[in-house]
């Protein structure tokens, strides 16, 4: 019995690291593709951006661990779009918003962590000519995402500007 308890305790930290597993695999498989643009902003970049930000934005940036973006124009790499939607429809993600009006279809999916557990926001922007996947990972909640939009940090698709 003690051995099983020890094994369980040793495997418990792996449960937290598996949270981003699906998107990590997706990002790594397409980041090096020649016809996919990739951007990755790490924790150090968040620290640099925080220095010049107003206090509210600085507080939000403090919780962000990484921002990763993949963008591809038509014709997309084989399965790129389908696999992105498959990651978003993972049982851990919850759809929090979808817009299908003028411009690209934009969907937001969210996994909310608790305490020091990482949360993740995934945005899929499905336009006529371009498909964009944005992933924000860190310690934040839905209210923090709402504050970002109140600070005017929105996607061009969300505010109707090209």
Task: Say what each PLM segment does.
Residues 131, 135-162:
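C-terminal partner/receptor-binding element of secreted or periplasmic proteins
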Residues 77-91, 134-136, 145:
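Surface-exposed flexible segments
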Residues 20-80:
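Early exported N-terminus immediately downstream of N-terminal targeting peptides
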Residues 33-36, 42, 62-64, 90, ...:
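Extracytoplasmic
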Residues 109-142:
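A short, solvent-exposed beta-edge/loop patch
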Residues 85-113, 158-162:
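Short Gly/Thr-rich strand-loop-strand
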Residues 4-14:
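Sec-dependent N-terminal signal peptides
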């Amino acid at each position: 019995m003690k051995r099983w308890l020890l094994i369980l305790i040793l495997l418990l930290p792996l449960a937290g690291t598996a949270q981003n597993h699906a998107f990590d695999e997706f990002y790594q498989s397409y980041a090096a593709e020649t016809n996919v643009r990739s951007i990755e902003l790490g924790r150090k970049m968040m620290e640099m951006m925080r220095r010049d930000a107003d206090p509210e934005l600085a507080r939000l940036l403090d919780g962000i661990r990484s921002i990763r973006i993949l963008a591809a124009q038509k014709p997309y790499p084989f399965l790129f779009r389908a696999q992105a939607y498959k990651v978003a429809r993972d049982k851990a993600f919850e759809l929090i918003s979808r817009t299908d009006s003028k411009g690209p279809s934009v969907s937001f999916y969210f996994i909310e962590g608790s305490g020091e557990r990482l949360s993740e926001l995934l945005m899929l922007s499905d336009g006529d000519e371009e498909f964009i996947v944005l992933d924000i990972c860190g310690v934040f909640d839905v209210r923090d995402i709402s504050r970002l939009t109140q600070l005017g940090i929105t996607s061009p698709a969300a505010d109707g500007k090209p």
